[in-house]
UniProtKB/Swiss-Prot annotation:
GO molecular function: 3'-5'-RNA exonuclease activity; magnesium ion binding; polyribonucleotide nucleotidyltransferase activity; RNA binding
Domain annotation S1 motif: ranges: 623-691
Cell location: Cytoplasm
Pfam family, one: RNase_PH
Cellular component terms per the entry's GO annotation: cytosol
Positions annotated to bind Mg(2+): D487, D493
Enzyme class: transferase
Naturally occurring in which organism (per UniProt): Methylocella silvestris (strain DSM 15510 / CIP 108128 / LMG 27833 / NCIMB 13906 / BL2)
Reported function: Involved in mRNA degradation. Catalyzes the phosphorolysis of single-stranded polyribonucleotides processively in the 3'- to 5'-direction.
Any one of the GO BP annotations: RNA processing
Keyword field: Cytoplasm, Magnesium, Metal-binding, Nucleotidyltransferase, RNA-binding, Transferase
Protein name as it appears in the record: Polyribonucleotide nucleotidyltransferase
Record keyword Secreted present: no
SMART domains: KH (SM00322), S1 (SM00316)
């Protein structure tokens, strides 16, 4: 019934299996991939005919994690998987980025990749396996695809690079780098690092590239056995339409790209585009070319004009040379009620970044296949349409916004203080108010400034820069701080963020073959110079964290209580902790290890809550004086509640100096008194005294008498 084909190999000490022919046989391509005991199913389907009226490749990648893969039932009311999680969105982008450039130019057929995680061993992250399975499914599908693609993860543990570290090993790693590419070229890099050098980062990229070569070989072997007949792809002759567009537009387009202001340049380019449309689509005659072909030819001519100017003249769209960073203005403290704020402007790109500090209650609960965990650092990136002078959809963030936010999150996170050093939940919001390239890196710069403005003790400020590359044969040019046009007209887009000490985040997307290790080294070195320049400009606004937290930020103090006392502090049904919160006004968060965080904007509120918690969790000390309340008066003395829920007896002989006839002559129920803890009797009952305490001042009279006696002897 099944015609199953399988390839197996040992990859970084674990078995990788690629199988096709048993599951999802009606898809154009389907591969079941297993690494360790993690299994994913990748399927790909592409329409047989192009989608009319579009000038882009309609590729959709959907990565989905099923809770059953880890033996879990989803949370929530409906108990089933819902909208994509942040990780699912990020992995979908991770798969999309290296495969998209490998489809033929002009391919307009609707194409959908669906990757489903079926089993997760909690040791091998499914993301790399998902990328490998997708590549294999495309390679055997018969769909036009210039692959296969391989992928690998590289860590840096105990001073050595490690291929495909496990989930646990990654927790100890100073690097989390994912690299993807073909047999002879790197196409994509995504990473987070703890201030590593450019040299080490490049070495990690090349280690990953070498590491996935056996996987590419295995995919090729699978395709030799199981690949479908390749589809025929009609290759359009573009020479005639390109010549027609060039004759009409080249001269004026060159002039348009001498205009340095973005909006004015766009107007000039639109005017040239309108001229082409008028010439090639006359109202009184049948057009020679389709609108899609003319639009494609015009875009290609735009790219050529920009590239010629850069390679031949060394001049960029806005008039800069290759290495110059646009003018920078950094401002902090611009929002009066925010805990920390910054406005970072670089040329025509601007980010308004706001830092907010919260308590443990504000931590985000993240539900994943590995289990539920809490995240104390959040970074949200928003890209409203007005930032590029357009109208558009507003609402929940799209994939691009989630991806850009995660890139900035990775860049800043290694510089944050630990939870023990700074027990706050931190949220960053970056509002992109203007954009002309590199808005995610503006978010990195603005985030550092806003955090320091809020008083967060960063190890060092972080800055980021977006770089580009133009490659024609043997000639190439590396561009610092690219514009939006240079991004989509160039051959490589990579973003580097870090401190003066090293790189904290690197993202790279390469669109063409031929970019060598040497070219990437030149680009990384040039990016370092740009990053250090930006850090210098940022230091003009703020060089380090403010000494005090923002005026409106909550204050948090921590204390440790014995774990066996947690239940007493919380009380039955939360009764005790609710009473503490209601009466002191402080927020209280108790961890399983006995760490208690008490937060309030009022210092007295924090002190009162801490004293209350200590009175419950700690044992009273002999010789200490406490304030208490008389709860019962009896013939032989009075019972006083003096330490949380603890009561003790003040014997009638200890109520006052001299003889006391009746206890009620000295104290009454409900009266506030000061008592000294004398100790405990044979049965563990508490013995208290009032006679040795000044009821007005709380002074220890016994200690005072002893001191006076000692002084007289001396």
């Amino acid at each position: 019934m099944f015609e199953i084909h399988r390839e197996e190999l040992d990859w970084a000490g674990r078995k990788l299996t690629l199988e096709t022919g048993r599951i999802a046989r009606q898809a154009d391509g389907a591969v079941l991939a297993t690494y360790g005991e993690t299994t994913v199913l990748a399927t790909v389907v592409s329409a047989r005919t192009p989608k009319p009226g579009i000038d882009f490749f309609p590729l959709t990648v959907n990565y989905q994690e099923k809770a059953f893969a880890a033996g879990r039932i989803p949370g929530g009311y409906f108990k089933r998987e819902g909208r994509p999680s942040e990780k699912e969105t990020l992995v979908s982008r991770l798969i999309d980025r290296p495969i998209r450039p490998l489809f033929p130019e002009g391919y307009r057929n609707d194409t959908q990749v669906v990757v489903t995680v079926l089993s997760h061993d909690l040791e091998n992250d499914p993301d790399i396996l998902a990328l490998v399975a997708t590549s294999a499914a495309l390679t055997i599908s018969g769909i036009p695809f210039m692959g296969p693609v391989g992928g690998a993860r590289v860590g840096y543990i105990n001073g050595a690079l490690k291929l495909n570290p496990t989930v646990d090993e990654l927790k100890e790693s100073a690097l989390d780098l994912v690299v993807a590419g073909t047999g002879d070229a790197v196409l994509m890099v995504e990473s987070e690092a703890k201030e590593l050098s450019e040299t080490l980062m490049l070495e990690a990229v090349m280690t990953g590239h070498r590491g996935f070569q056996p996987v590419i070989d295995a995919i090729i072997r699978l395709a030799e056995k199981a690949a479908k007949e390749p589809r025929e792809l009609a290759v359009a002759d573009k020479a005639e339409v390109e010549a027609a567009v060039r004759d009409i537009a080249e001269g004026e387009l060159r002039e348009a790209y001498k205009i340095t202001a973005k909006q004015e340049r766009y107007k000039a380019v639109d005017a040239v585009k309108a001229k082409v449309a008028l010439a090639l689509f006359p109202e009184d005659a049948e057009p020679r070319f389709s609108k899609e072909k003319v639009a494609e030819a015009f875009h290609d001519l735009q790219a050529k004009v920009v590239r010629w100017n850069i390679l031949d003249l060394g001049v960029r769209i806005d008039g800069r040379d290759l290495k110059t960073v646009r003018p920078i203005l950094a401002e902090v403290g611009i929002l009066p009620r925010a805990h920390g704020s910054a406005l970072f402007t670089r040329g025509e790109t601007q980010a308004l970044v706001v830092a907010t500090l919260g308590t443990g209650e504000d931590e985000q609960f993240v539900d994943s296949l590995e289990g539920t965990y809490k995240e104390r650092f959040l970074l949200h990136y928003n890209f409203p349409p007005y930032s590029v002078g357009e109208t558009g959809r507003m609402g929940s963030p799209g994939r691009r916004e989630i991806g850009h936010g995660k890139l900035a999150w990775r860049a800043v996170r290694p510089m944050l203080p630990t939870a023990a050093e700074f027990p706050y939940t931190i949220r960053i919001v970056s509002e992109i108010t203007e954009s002309n390239g590199s808005s995610s890196m503006a978010t990195v710069c603005g985030s550092s400034l806003a955090l320091m403005d809020a008083g967060v003790p960063l190890k060092r400020p972080t800055a980021g820069i977006a770089m580009g590359l133009i490659l024609e044969g043997e000639r190439f040019a590396v561009l610092s701080d690219i514009l939006g046009d240079e991004d989509h007209l160039g051959d490589m887009d990579f973003k580097v963020a870090g401190t003066e000490e090293g790189v904290t985040s690197l993202q790279m997307d390469i669109k063409v073959a031929g970019i060598t290790e040497e070219i990437m080294k030149v680009a990384l070195d040039q990016a370092k110079g740009g990053r250090l320049h930006i850090l210098g400009e940022m230091s003009k606004a703020l060089t380090g964290a403010r000494a005090e937290l923002g005026e409106f930020a909550p204050r948090i103090e921590t204390l440790k209580i014995p774990t066996d006392k947690i239940r007493e502090v919380i009380g039955t049904g939360g009764k005790v902790i609710r009473e503490i919160v209601e009466k002191t006004g402080a927020k209280i968060n108790i961890e399983d290890d006995g760490t208690v965080k008490v937060a309030s904007s009022d210092g007295n509120s924090i002190k009162a809550a801490i004293a209350w918690i200590k009175s419950i969790a700690n044992d009273p000390e002999v010789g200490q004086i406490y304030e208490g309340t008389v709860v019962k008066v009896v013939d032989f003395g009075a019972f006083v509640n003096f330490f949380g829920s603890k009561d003790g007896l003040v014997h009638i002989s200890q109520l006052a100096k001299g003889r006391v006839a009746k206890s009620s002559d000295v104290v009454k129920e409900g009266e506030k008194v000061k008592v000294k803890l004398l100790g405990f009797d044979d049965r563990g009952k508490v013995r208290l005294s009032m006679r040795y305490v000044d009821q007005e001042t709380g002074e220890d009279l016994e200690a005072k008498e002893k001191a006076e006696q000692q002084a007289s002897v001396d």
